[in-house]
Amino acid sequence: MTDILEKIVAVKRQEIAAAIARKPLTAMRADAESRVLTRDFVAALRGKIAAGQPAVIAEIKKSSPSKGVLREDFIPADIAQSYAEHGAACLSVLTDLQFFRGCIDYLKQARASCPLPVLRKDFMLDAYQIYESRACGADAVLLIAAILDDAQMKDLEAIARSLDMAVLVEVHDAPELARALQLKTPLIGINNRNLKTFEVSLDTTLTLMRELPADRLLVCESGIHTRDDVLRMGAAGVNAFLVGEAFMRAPDPGLALAELFATA
């Protein structure tokens, strides 16, 4: 890890320690285990695909390290409703504070305002965060292969599965993909953005998807901005996408989704 990602991880470790000091692991785990009825994230994606529609994980993100503030008029509940009304399969909510100006309350607000399953998008390093995710209502969590070793990925996935949460494991290169395929989750996110440099290329998905077994569901992440991008990926057999920035900059995020993916 280098540069931006290394900084994010260092800050995240401090945040986790502070969170545990405020509320111990045993208490957070009890809260998580008392939650019932997750919304089925994988089924929501598969349902769209089975109907011949693009399965879009629509992201709620106020800011990013590379682009700064994406949306000043930022009301997560309204954005979530707009996404749901315009054909999104699921939501992704950024909860990292320091680098993305997110928070857990944004996830709670988004989930309360619509029926869609919600992914907590953050930098997961510790079991505490998985329990925290379920306690705040998340239906799925993101695991980033670049910041976790094999044992950590398997442990965090096992905890998520024990809480009936889905896991989206994110990769950027062939070695990371090989490691991700050791997990049980069917969801493999190929991030076209290099988290070490924040450079983006859709060729990342087109190259790595050749190594993906048929029983896994590929989610194309980052770099989808135009209808041509969607058509290019669709022609290659990609039918699930995670998109945020393109929608966050639009006056109506849900309408932007419908126009980009022709879901209207």
From Swiss-Prot:
SUPFAM superfamilies in alphabetical order: Ribulose-phoshate binding barrel
EC class name: lyase
What is a GO molecular function of this protein?
A: indole-3-glycerol-phosphate synthase activity
Entry EC no(s): 4.1.1.48
Keyword annotations for this protein?
Answer: Amino-acid biosynthesis, Aromatic amino acid biosynthesis, Decarboxylase, Lyase, Tryptophan biosynthesis
Q: Which CDD domains match?
A: IGPS (cd00331)
Q: Which PROSITE patterns match?
A: IGPS
Give me the segments passing through the membrane.
none
BP GO annotations: L-tryptophan biosynthetic process
Q: Which Pfam families match?
A: IGPS (PF00218)
Instruction: Write down the PANTHER family for this protein, in alphabetical order.
Output: INDOLE-3-GLYCEROL-PHOSPHATE SYNTHASE, TRYPTOPHAN BIOSYNTHESIS PROTEIN
NCBIfam families the UniProt entry points to: PRK00278.1-2, PRK00278.1-6, PRK00278.2-4
Indicate what this protein is called per its UniProt record: Indole-3-glycerol phosphate synthase
Q: Which organism is it from?
A: Albidiferax ferrireducens (strain ATCC BAA-621 / DSM 15236 / T118) (Rhodoferax ferrireducens)
